[in-house]
Each structure stands twice: as C-alpha cells, then as structure tokens.
C-alpha cells in the first residue's frame, strides 16, 4: 500500500566548516578567568567556587563561553622552558594575510625583503 506507518528521525552533525567557524568564533571571544570564592556559607557549598573574569570590566562567563586560566606562551620568541623555537629568521609571505604572512609571523619586529630573479629553461612554444 502507499501509507507509511513508521517514521525514523536521526540527528545529523553540521558540516566541518560550520563547526570550525563556531569554534573559531568562541576562541576569538575567549576570556581569561580566575577561580573566585563566593563565601564560606556551608549551605551554598555548590556555589562556593566560581569563575570570575580576570578583568573586572568584563561580564562573568556563561556556561557556553570559552574561558582559559593561563596565558599562552609567547610563540614569537625562543623559550627552552616551553620548547618554542620562535619565529626569528623564518621566511614569510609579505602579501599573505594568513599564518604565513609577515605581519603575523614576524610579531611586529619588522622584516627584510629580498627580490630574487630566477631563470629557468622551459619547453615554451610561441
């Protein structure tokens, strides 16, 4: 017959791009927090510890906000303690706004440009 008596529902994950954009948005809005202490009343033991923004001018984080306790190491400079090599001496792309771009990779230190002329043989036909 042409009737349908069973319906199946399922949940589907969003696209990888959608998830990535969502996480990047949360990451860009993340704030540093400290562990606060509301008081010593034993009745409010569940609320004894809570997260407070490090900067009092910021609003307290919601359960959906991305927060962090420790600052990230400075990846621009060498550090044997954290194992970061730094970015000094690296090659960068002066026209790129991405991670390989000089503005980001050189950490505001400035950079030297080098123009190089390369002559190569090719199988060109005119």
From Swiss-Prot:
GO molecular function annotation: cytokine activity; frizzled binding
Q: Which Pfam families match?
A: wnt
* Disulphide bond pairs: 92-107
Q: Which residues are glycosylated?
A: 93, 123
Lipid anchor (O-palmitoleoyl serine) at which residues? 1
**Which keywords are on file for this protein?**
Developmental protein, Disulfide bond, Extracellular matrix, Glycoprotein, Lipoprotein, Secreted, Wnt signaling pathway
Task: Give the UniProt record's GO annotations in the biological process aspect.
Answer: canonical Wnt signaling pathway; cell fate commitment; neuron differentiation
Q: How is it modified after translation?
A: Palmitoleoylation is required for efficient binding to frizzled receptors. Palmitoleoylation is necessary for proper trafficking to cell surface. Depalmitoleoylated by NOTUM, leading to inhibit Wnt signaling pathway.
Question: Which function does this protein serve?
Answer: Ligand for members of the frizzled family of seven transmembrane receptors. Acts in the canonical Wnt signaling pathway by promoting beta-catenin-dependent transcriptional activation. Plays an essential role in the development of the embryonic brain and central nervous system (CNS). Has a role in osteoblast function, bone development and bone homeostasis.
- Recorded protein name is Protein Wnt-1
The gene that this protein is the product of is WNT-1
